[in-house]
């Protein structure tokens, strides 16, 4: 973990996290919460990864801009990220959209979400702004990116990674020269340009940017005065700097935190139900690509005070057991079997049930004799006795949200309709 001695640039930086998006492709999972507040990995929220990266990198001033259905997110931040101390020059600010610039406007775009809070940022006088998206899963040392930004004299440094070209239309895509200077940038192109020598890959923006604070404010004020701008970093700010200034690409491979030297870099969008399910289930592997057990780069979060998980009953056909699964505190597995399943806090599984490849959010109650396969179950759902999911695709699609890959998202309103 970086600290104030070996991370001098980070101690002069503020991390500004954009956490206002809904994440509509997650369907009903974001009906009640913003995407950054969605649960991940057994006990965390998605936003905890960006925040933990900032903290572990040595950054001690953090701000989070919120907008869409922010209550769950704000409550989590208040509970889990309240340990910053002003007397140590630390700060943690939650910045809901509050019509600070105009009484008629909320945040109009990602750039506007920073512009409306310029006065708050100025009060802390950071030298650098590390601008982050709050809805991705990855581990990264931002100090490395700050160092490249300073060494190359960049106006903006953009975090980037290689993605399959067929997936690149959802990203900002760039082209760079031998010195990593960006000479073209297009946001979410319909036909993403390939990388030289790699026709199936594109170089994509991670939505992570480093700016000198003074330069950023100048650009935000210029953009705010442009009536033709959508006030978005990817669509407006970055392309303008590429054309009129110096934009540099920072490869994620240079600063990602790996579980071991040979490990591949890990970054996930988890923006769809399928991707969300897969990234959680991957954690059940013997050696998962994402290492949550790394004490040198912990993922900080709010931990409820709950008792240990408990497994009860040991009879043939009624044995409480879990194979290749993650089971969080407060769970009780009563005479049922879990395989490749991830349970969040406080889940109760009653007897004679079999659950396979499931992601079950906190405080779900699964009644007796259920067979659940390839499911994501939202927080607090009460699964009725004898429910079978994962065996009849047509029936599943009629009752729940079933993806093309066969993953069923189950919420309480869906269960209520079954019982009506």
Curated annotation (Swiss-Prot):
Pathway as given in its UniProt record: Glycan biosynthesis; glycogen biosynthesis
Swiss-Prot/TrEMBL catalytic activity: alpha-D-glucose 1-phosphate + ATP + H(+) = ADP-alpha-D-glucose + diphosphate
Enzyme Commission identifier(s): 2.7.7.27
InterPro entries assigned to the protein according to its UniProt record, in alphabetical order: ADP-Glc_PPase (IPR011831), ADP_Glu_pyroP_CS (IPR005836), GlgC_bac (IPR023049), GlmU/GlgC-like_hexapep (IPR056818), NTP_transferase_dom (IPR005835), Nucleotide-diphossugar_trans (IPR029044), Trimer_LpxA-like_sf (IPR011004)
Gene Ontology biological process terms in this record: glycogen biosynthetic process
GO molecular function: ATP binding; glucose-1-phosphate adenylyltransferase activity
Positions contributing to alpha-D-glucose 1-phosphate binding: 107, 172, 187-188, 205
Keywords tagged on the record: ATP-binding, Carbohydrate metabolism, Glycogen biosynthesis, Glycogen metabolism, Nucleotide-binding, Nucleotidyltransferase, Transferase
HAMAP family tied to this protein: GlgC
Family: Belongs to the bacterial/plant glucose-1-phosphate adenylyltransferase family.
Subunit details: Homotetramer.
Purpose: Involved in the biosynthesis of ADP-glucose, a building block required for the elongation reactions to produce glycogen. Catalyzes the reaction between ATP and alpha-D-glucose 1-phosphate (G1P) to produce pyrophosphate and ADP-Glc.
Protein name: Glucose-1-phosphate adenylyltransferase
Organism: Rhodopseudomonas palustris (strain BisB18)
